[in-house]
């Protein structure tokens, strides 16, 4: 027989016996009851004796009641009065809270009573005291935390401790001491022992309360406990924590580390298969106008061509005709506008773009209204609006039963190299999203200038998608496809795209790379510029521009012959410019179609994503497209069945983002020889260095928690302490990671000119042989340093990251591109080869993308979240810029003249609000001509700008929190890619310098003179060593470019870049000159096999290379070496200064000014190496320290 608590009465009833067994799945588990605490223990109330019938209810007159199963009247018995069945579960009297004391950071275990009134009453009974008469148990039962102090004052204990539970398990202790009573009442009369205290006297024992939100509990006891630092479990003596719990705590609970790694968001690479697209391809021609801010470039001609889906093309063509655009005679879909008037081109193009996006937006709105005929009645009944267009988006999405098939429209404004020039010139006119689109659209804008270019300028007009829902089956996503349910909105997107960002070359070279027809000839733009600036240009008798306007004599003759073939008597410079510009637009439009088809075919065939409707223009750059393909390949391989890439490939964020970025170190670029070198020189280049590095193992999996991380770090330190024993890069016992290290170099006779690591401690990146302190390095770098003889010590750092395993995560991506490139070479498919080469080289750059906390917005683009962040002090406005008013369309009111009488002028100083005389004469009137006593004032013209103040102001916003939130790029992969490239160069240095170990640096022969990121300039001795010791790394002798996990070893190849053009053998330069990094020249190339000679090579970064030659660079070096200060060498080139948003005075937003840059040509002055003699340079070392290093660090001497 079991006892159960009655529903309301404070008594227990006996349960009727039940002979049947309870089903196992419904059996109630009995919890052991805890003994009452000693201070609060009281006598239990015992249940009355059970009745003979076994029921707790009074027996009926008929004797024992019948069984409910047999008595039909029992169906009418209320459920509350039926005999309860089951096992008794006594309610818990106490709760347990484990928390951290905010004052001492001590873990605590707080045991508290769940029933405040009952516990406080029993506590008073145990201590032979009573509650104050004005404090009833009912008041205690309904009390919340706001009345706790009033209750304490009524109780008047000696002391009351209040533990308040805060966020994340932290408790704060406060002590309340009740005020003393007035005189005569503070002293209580003595009472006999074991007698209750007299009424009105305070309690004689302290109290302790726990506040959880608004709930108050009486604390039984507070005990200090221990807390595991790895899993956060509280324990008294010992405990066991699992690796899973440690990982969960580290990644999700710990307030310090839970935001260090973020899951990378994912969406399929393909676009919606029903997307309707319209492409407006355009180009502009400009002339130079001397404005208030220098030589500004003003457009005088704009040509555009339409392409895409036929219905949208037809609508755009008709709109252009209706707006007065001229049609080019050679193509019905090409229109143009020519006018030298400043701002006219931009105004007309803005009008067309506004009308076009308004036309497409209304088309989308019409289809939405047609699919929802109840919209008008609902808007009238619910909001009192006569037209649905007066609804807002927030109101529209509440429309019940939204129906229809969603539509997706995309408008692309495309050009070649427009983001760095054309769009900036036109931006002040065309950047506008205030078109008269219907009100229910949700309008968002993505505007991002970067490095002087407009990277994004996209506007989205969105409506609710009735078919949107959360995806649960991800099979379609694994194949790169998507459908109606994956989009929250149906939309019209207006996007600006630059084909230069997808080809990284000029339009002429891009046309050749993608097998497009290219027209011969070019235009004399200098003559056109002079024509618009001065009204004329120098020409021959037939009007053809003279030779000085062309690049050289050859270009002049070619273009003159091409024009003569047209049979025209007089050269029309404007018409010729129009034809050249229109032909450029035709080539760009063909390039757009070629890129769309070629990339879609590549993704479908080479990558194997047959369900992906890939559109390369959906993303603005080749880097973003390569990263999207990589994410899609990873998602297909891992099948995470979620909207991210899963827990195995994460992105470093917050503190870890800066920590990982510190391990990303740039390439090697410096000469170890300055001056003229008169001995054979060969140039070797690593074949696809970043592609080969990407195929090597990368860190994989969620980073280890601190406990497992410490074990992995100890294994690394034990391996590093074994001096003289080389570590295998692919030792499975050593896990990948990023560490903070100290490293000491070996003896200087064991060093060489190719250090294994570089440092920024001196403010500039230096490849140095000095000791390293506090550097952030990958585990690959640890092996490289150790194998080169360095002593490496791991510095304890809570940010140290160790991953659970290696994985060739990017190998499949690189293999696809290499296979496509080889297939393109066999099939002579230049387009496929260009795509594969670009994608192969772009992935590393996407990993290394640097994020910041800044963004640039227009005043009218700041949403509610941004404004809230500014008011809360979380976002600062770093600078504000205003658009140049000359670039805005304006209306000018002409000058006018008004006359005033003396009486009217007397009102000039009066307050308008003081005059209530409605019969007073108006101050403006036109008196008869020649009226005496009147004064005439002539008002200057007034300019009314056609723009809102929000359209004219750009704000640069920056978050106050300097930590970067990253959920897009796995930046640590970039660290390991660069680390593998350093391992390649380290092995290369072994081929050249291992035989010199033990010989002083000054006594060693010259083997290399210049090192670039992926190349090395070697002498004849170095060339022989490459052909012998490094033979397996030379491509012509065979070898692999892709890492093989079955046979793990460093995989990289080089080839000689200086080859003979006649026989293909390795050639050398007999004489060379080196002035500075990226400033050198090879006089010529000589082939030792066939004796042929060819043109050398010249590199002059930042200089106009066409104005330099080998002899000039030799003269420059000799003049500097001989101290001839009077003789100066320089180069000049025309540069375009682009300003998008700047706080600098004189730099106005959205302007392009033309300037002439003059740069002095001279040898390297601010060197990052130490001089060994007149020509030779060496990396810094302990005997030749870096003079820039001023950082102080603690070093313990042995």
From Swiss-Prot:
One of its GO terms (cellular component) is host cell nucleus. It catalyses: DNA(n) + a 2'-deoxyribonucleoside 5'-triphosphate = DNA(n+1) + diphosphate. GO terms for molecular function: 3'-5' exonuclease activity; DNA binding; DNA-directed DNA polymerase activity; nucleotide binding. The keyword Transmembrane does not apply. It is found in: Host nucleus. GO terms for biological process: DNA-templated DNA replication; viral DNA genome replication. Keywords: DNA replication, DNA-binding, DNA-directed DNA polymerase, Host nucleus, Nucleotidyltransferase, Transferase, Viral DNA replication. Residues 1-87, 179-199, 904-930 are annotated as: Disordered. SMART domains: POLBc. Disulfide bonds: none annotated. Its main location: host cell. Its EC number is 2.7.7.7. Belongs to the DNA polymerase type-B family. This DNA polymerase requires a protein as a primer. Heterodimer with the terminal protein; this heterodimer binds to bp 9 to 18 of the genome. Forms a complex with viral pTP, DBP and hosts NFIA and POU2F1/OCT1 for initiation of replication. This is DNA polymerase. It comes from Human adenovirus C serotype 5 (HAdV-5).
């Amino acid at each position: 027989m079991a006892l159960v608590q009655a529903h309301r009465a404070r008594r227990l009833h006996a349960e009727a016996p039940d002979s049947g067994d309870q089903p196992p799945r419904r059996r109630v588990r009995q919890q052991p009851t805890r003994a009452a605490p000693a201070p609060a223990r009281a006598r239990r109330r015992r249940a009355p004796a059970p009745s003979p019938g076994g029921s707790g209810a009074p027996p009926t007159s008929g004797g024992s009641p019948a069984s409910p199963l047999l008595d039909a009247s029992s169906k009418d018995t209320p459920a509350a009065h039926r005999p309860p069945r089951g096992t008794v579960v006594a309610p818990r009297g106490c709760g347990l809270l484990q928390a951290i004391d905010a004052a001492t950071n001590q873990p605590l275990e707080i045991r508290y009573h769940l029933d405040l009134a009952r516990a406080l009453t029993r506590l008073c009974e145990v201590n032979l005291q009573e509650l104050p008469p004005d404090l009833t148990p009912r008041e205690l039962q309904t009390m919340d935390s706001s009345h706790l102090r009033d209750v304490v004052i009524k109780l008047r204990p000696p002391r009351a401790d209040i533990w308040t539970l805060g966020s994340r398990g932290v408790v704060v202790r406060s002590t309340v001491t009740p005020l003393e009573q007035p005189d005569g009442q503070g002293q209580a009369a003595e009472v006999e022992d074991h007698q209750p205290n007299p009424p009105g006297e305070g309690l004689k024992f302290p109290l302790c309360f726990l506040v959880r939100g608004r709930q108050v509990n009486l604390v039984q006891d507070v005990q200090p406990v221990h807390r595991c630092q790895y899993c956060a479990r509280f324990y008294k003596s010992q405990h066991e924590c699992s690796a899973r719990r440690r990982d969960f705590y580290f990644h999700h609970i710990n307030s310090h580390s839970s935001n260090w790694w973020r899951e990378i968001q994912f969406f399929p690479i393909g676009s919606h298969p029903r997307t309707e697209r319209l492409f407006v391809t355009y180009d502009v021609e400009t002339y130079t106008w001397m404005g208030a801010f220098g030589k500004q470039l003003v457009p005088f001609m704009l040509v555009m061509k339409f392409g895409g889906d036929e219905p949208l093309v037809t609508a755009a063509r008709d709109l252009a005709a209706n707006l007065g655009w001229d049609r080019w005679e050679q193509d019905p879909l090409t229109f143009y506008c020519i006018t030298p008037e400043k701002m006219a081109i931009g105004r007309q193009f803005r009008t067309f773009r506004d009308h076009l996006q308004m036309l497409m937006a209304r088309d989308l709105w019409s289809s939405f209204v047609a699919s929802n005929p109840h919209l008008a009645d609902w808007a009238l009944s619910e909001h009192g609006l006569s037209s649905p267009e007066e609804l807002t988006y927030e109101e529209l999405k509440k429309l019940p039963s939204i129906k229809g098939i969603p539509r997706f429209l995309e408008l692309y404004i495309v050009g070649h190299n427009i983001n760095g020039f054309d769009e900036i010139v036109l931006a002040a006119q065309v950047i506008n999203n205030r078109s008269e689109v219907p009100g229910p659209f949700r309008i968002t804008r993505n505007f991002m200038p970067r490095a002087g270019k407009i990277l994004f300028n996209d506007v989205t007009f969105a409506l609710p998608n009735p078919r949107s829902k959360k995806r649960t089956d991800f099979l379609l996503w694994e194949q790169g496809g998507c459908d109606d349910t994956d989009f929250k909105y149906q939309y019209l997107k207006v996007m600006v795209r630059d084909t230069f960002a997808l080809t990284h070359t000029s339009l002429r070279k891009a046309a050749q790379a993608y097998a497009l027809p290219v027209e011969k000839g070019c235009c004399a733009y200098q003559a056109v510029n002079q024509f618009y600036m001065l009204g004329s240009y120098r020409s021959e008798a037939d009007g053809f521009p003279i030779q000085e306007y062309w690049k050289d004599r050859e270009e002049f003759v070619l273009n003159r012959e091409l024009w003569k073939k047209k049979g025209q008597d007089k050269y029309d410079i404007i018409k010729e410019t129009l034809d050249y510009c229109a032909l450029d637009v035709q080539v760009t439009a063909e390039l757009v179609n070629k890129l769309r088809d070629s990339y879609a075919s590549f993704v479908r065939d080479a990558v194997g994503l047959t369900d992906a409707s890939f559109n390369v223009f959906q993303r603005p750059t080749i880097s973003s497209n390569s990263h999207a393909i990589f994410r899609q390949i990873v998602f297909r391989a891992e099948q995470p069945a979620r909207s991210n890439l899963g827990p195995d490939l994460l992105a470093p964020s917050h503190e870890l983002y800066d920590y990982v970025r510190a391990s990303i170190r740039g390439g090697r670029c410096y000469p170890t020889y300055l001056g003229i070198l008169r001995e054979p020189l060969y140039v070797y280049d690593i074949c696809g260095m970043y592609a080969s590095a990407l195929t090597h193992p990368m860190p994989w999996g969620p980073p280890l928690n601190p406990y497992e991380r410490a074990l992995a770090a100890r294994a690394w330190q034990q391996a590093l302490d074994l001096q003289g024993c080389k570590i295998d890069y692919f030792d499975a016992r050593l896990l990948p990671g990023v560490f903070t290290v100290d490293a000491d170099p070996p003896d200087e006779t064991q060093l060489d000119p190719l250090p294994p690591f570089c440092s920024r401690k001196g403010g500039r990146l230096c490849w140095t042989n000095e000791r390293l302190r506090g550097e952030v390095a990958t585990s690959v770098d640890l092996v490289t340093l150790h194998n080169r003889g360095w002593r490496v010590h791991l510095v304890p750092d809570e940010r140290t990251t160790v991953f659970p395993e290696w994985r060739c995560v990017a190998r499949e991506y690189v293999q696809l591109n290499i296979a496509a490139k080889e297939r393109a070479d066999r099939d002579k498919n230049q387009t496929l080869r260009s795509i594969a080469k670009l994608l192969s080289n772009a992935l590393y750059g996407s990993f290394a993308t640097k994020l910041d906390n800044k963004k640039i917005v227009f005043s009218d683009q700041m949403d509610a979240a941004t404004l809230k962040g500014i008011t809360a002090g979380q976002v600062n406005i770093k600078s504000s810029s205003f658009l140049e008013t000359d670039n805005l369309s304006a209306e000018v009111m002409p000058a006018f003249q008004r006359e005033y009488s003396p009486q009217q002028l007397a009102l000039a100083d009066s307050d308008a609000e003081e005059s209530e005389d409605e019969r007073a004469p108006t101050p403006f009137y036109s008196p008869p001509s020649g009226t005496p006593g009147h004064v005439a004032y002539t008002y200057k013209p007034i300019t009314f700008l056609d723009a809102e103040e929000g359209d004219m102001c750009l704000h640069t916003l920056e978050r106050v929190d300097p930590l970067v939130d990253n959920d897009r790029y796995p930046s640590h992969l970039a660290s390991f890619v660069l680390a593998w490239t350093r391992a390649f160069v380290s092995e290369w240095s072994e081929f050249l310098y291992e035989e010199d170990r033990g010989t002083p640096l000054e006594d060693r022969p010259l083997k290399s003179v210049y090192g670039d990121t992926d190349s090395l300039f070697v002498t004849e001795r170095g060339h022989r060593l490459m052909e012998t010791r490094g033979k397996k790394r030379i491509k012509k002798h065979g070898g692999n470019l892709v890492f093989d996990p079955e046979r793990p070893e460093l995989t990289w190849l080089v080839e000689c870049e200086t080859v003979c053009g006649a026989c293909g053998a390795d050639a050398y330069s007999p004489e060379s000159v080196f002035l500075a990094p990226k400033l050198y020249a090879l006089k010529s190339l000589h082939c030792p096999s066939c004796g042929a000679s060819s043109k050398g090579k010249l590199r002059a970064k930042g200089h106009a290379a066409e104005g330099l030659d080998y002899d000039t660079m030799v003269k420059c070096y000799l003049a500097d070496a001989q101290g001839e200060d009077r003789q100066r060498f320089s180069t000049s080139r025309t540069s375009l200064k682009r300003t998008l948003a700047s706080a600098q005075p004189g730099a106005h937003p959205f302007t392009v000014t033309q300037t002439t840059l003059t740069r002095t040509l001279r040898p390297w002055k601010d060197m990052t190496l130490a001089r060994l003699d007149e020509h030779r340079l060496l990396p810094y070392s302990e005997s030749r320290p870096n003079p820039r290093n001023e950082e102080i660090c603690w070093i313990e001497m042995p």
